[in-house]
Amino acid sequence: MKTGPFLTKPGAKSIGLRLAWAAAAVMALSVGVAEAGQSMVASEIEKSFRGVTLDGIYNDGTFFSETYFDDGSIRYHDAAGADSGDWSVRENLFCTFYEGQQGACFFVEREGANCFIFFEPVRAADGRIVPREIWTSRGWNRKAAATCSKPPEAVI
């Protein structure tokens, strides 16, 4: 007589219970991953950006590239030049501060597997800090195809 974790009674096969276990496993693996329109949490931000180079575009159409090194340093490039600084995650906000230009902290939302949308924090009427409605920039890990819903465009 066979028994096991997926059998409801000795010798019986239970598809329903197997499906329940499979669904539970999938849900456990997806815990902590922001869905579209939801801000990412600190651990997800750090895991997504540490040691990665993002290529991206600001909402004004300017392209940039930024490398987030494991030691917390950052290297930034755009059409106007390059800069260095530091990156960190503070209270679920992604922060970048530079030697030669102003830095800031941002809410980050994920769009698909490889598109990160950055929003400036603003104070809501009730006093909470929330993402601004209009995105500041979008970026993607250059090692994979971007999954942003509208592909970036260059203005020529």
Which sequence ranges carry the predicted segments?
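Lipid interaction determinants
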Residues: G32-S84, T96-I156
